[in-house]
């Protein structure tokens, strides 16, 4: 699967789960289970409940995703 097939959305982290998993409420109202991408994990970027994040979803399973970016707070 190429990067063109991925669906990228923004959302808010609502819950932190074990093993670097997070529950994210997307802007369109859906709720997904997301894990952290390797670059965020490698650079020790902390993600807390309430943070705005970018999530990549595959068209095959829209209930799971990957957090690729933590948006800055305004």
Swiss-Prot record:
InterPro entries recorded for this chain? NA-bd_OB-fold (IPR012340), RNA-binding_domain_S1_IF1 (IPR006196), S1_domain (IPR003029), TIF_IF1 (IPR004368)
Q: Which SUPFAM superfamilies match?
A: Nucleic acid-binding proteins (SSF50249)
Cytoplasm listed as a keyword: yes
Where is it chiefly localized? cytoplasm
Residues in domain S1-like? 1-72
Molecular function (Gene Ontology), one example: translation initiation factor activity
Its subcellular locations are: Cytoplasm
Q: What does this protein do?
A: One of the essential components for the initiation of protein synthesis. Stabilizes the binding of IF-2 and IF-3 on the 30S subunit to which N-formylmethionyl-tRNA(fMet) subsequently binds. Helps modulate mRNA selection, yielding the 30S pre-initiation complex (PIC). Upon addition of the 50S ribosomal subunit IF-1, IF-2 and IF-3 are released leaving the mature 70S translation initiation complex.
Q: Which NCBIfam families match?
A: infA
Listed under subunit, the entry gives: Component of the 30S ribosomal translation pre-initiation complex which assembles on the 30S ribosome in the order IF-2 and IF-3, IF-1 and N-formylmethionyl-tRNA(fMet); mRNA recruitment can occur at any time during PIC assembly.
Q: Which HAMAP family match?
A: IF_1 (MF_00075)
Family to which this protein belongs: Belongs to the IF-1 family.
Protein name, entry field:
Translation initiation factor IF-1
Which organism is this protein's natural source?
Answer: Nostoc sp. (strain PCC 7120 / SAG 25.82 / UTEX 2576)
The protein's gene is named infA
